[in-house]
Amino acid sequence: MDKKTLYHIVEWAVALAACAFLGYKLVTFEDYPALWESLRSMAWQQYLALGLCVALMPVNMAIEAWRWRTLWNGDATLNGANGEANELTDERLTFKEAHRQVYYSKLAGVITPWRLGEYPARGVLLTNERMNELGSERIWPRVLAMGAVGSATMTFAIVLAGVPAIMANGEWLMANGEWWIAVGVILLLLVVGLALAPRLLRQYAEVSYGLIIKSVGQSLVRLICWCVQLALVLWALEAFSFQPSAISSLFIYYLLVTITPNVPIAEVGVRGAWAIVVFGSVNAAFAGVLLWVINTLLPCLGWFFFRKK
């Protein structure tokens, strides 16, 4: 069996495993009657808000594709494992390729803790499609290096926005010193890691501080898109008002979800539990479920439409 066939098998194995897991989550969800009752009693304006949230899903995915393409194409060379530089010509990712890889990576994300499988999944698809041009020994070091940078910059953006939000509107957390210790440790590790990234990763990829700053900016754009989606779903379920304190709670919610240890089987429950804590409404838990369907389930299904024939 050649490498390309092996990667093709892995590609479909991940897709089928993710579909099985998503099906399990849908079948075992126990609150369909209450969720249906909440949806059935909504006015047309609330349905419109849900529709806008769904419409923002492809925008969200396009932002992540933009972010991933920027990371991969961030400099003029593609370094191999032995450190030699190779000029990039046709080896740059197109937006279409990055877009397809981002959709596929959602499948791996739902079956791995903290969605750690997303960037390796992009490597699987990239290797499957570009094996002849690049070779797996040149793709994987860069995928893993840029994946580490991408994960760190996204987390840094969430912490960067979430900490001021807590300080402005998080009295219930301000009194809890353990949360501040956890957030402080995470922030310190992120700052140190990103500061050292150009030196630590130079054998595998050219990572500049300019690229890191650009990725943080793109991550903030994606976070804002998430917050708008969450606000729309919460408002549709009568669990949100567009007040400054409520808006800051959106950033607090994503910070808490991000720093909470999580496994795939408990992800929906964790998101729902934090939604109740932050927004103070049982309907907020349903908002977390609906947003999971919109931003996780739909993109997973979307890969079957965007995949390369």
Stretch-by-stretch model annotation:
Residues 98, 102, 133-151:
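Alpha-helical membrane-spanning segments of integral membrane proteins, especially the hydrophobic core
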Residues 129-142, 282-290:
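Membrane-interface alpha-helices at helix entry/exit sites of multi-pass transporters
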Residues 112, 116-117, 148-156:
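Membrane-embedded alpha-helical core segments of multi-pass
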